[in-house]
Design a protein with these regions (language model features):
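HIT superfamily nucleotide-processing domains
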Residues: 1-116
């Protein structure tokens, strides 16, 4: 399992940095965003370090699927049956600020379009 010793999310996976965990599996970890953009805002990450979603899909396609499985389970447990949004920001121009692949799960309010 690849890790980057300087990566904040790798440190969360290792338990070196605290986070409010809401879901864990053999390949994923999910925790609440510290700056939520919706009443429910959870980040789902692979335990392995990949800089973005494209790299994750190329390197561990099964783990990429596991992120979506985790997102569904989180949405159910958070009571988001009316709907929720899943977002990957990939690269600086897309406002990715932590370069460890992560899936945003947002819900608990009506979501407008376009998002940004």
């Amino acid at each position: 399992m690849a890790r980057d010793p300087d990566c904040l999310f790798c440190k969360i996976v290792a338990g070196d940095v605290p986070a409010e965990l809401v879901h864990e599996s053999a390949t994923t970890v999910a925790f609440r965003d510290l700056q939520p953009q919706a009443p429910t805002h959870v980040l789902v990450i692979p335990r392995s370090h990949y800089a973005n979603a494209a790299d994750l899909a190329a390197g561990e396609p099964e783990t990429a699927i596991h992120l979506f499985d985790a997102a569904r389970a989180i949405a159910e447990s958070e009571g988001l049956g009316e709907g929720y949004r899943m977002v990957f920001n990939t690269g600086p121009a897309a406002n990715q600020t932590v370069f460890h692949a992560h899936l945003h799960v947002l819900g608990g309010r009506s979501m407008g379009w376009p998002p940004g």
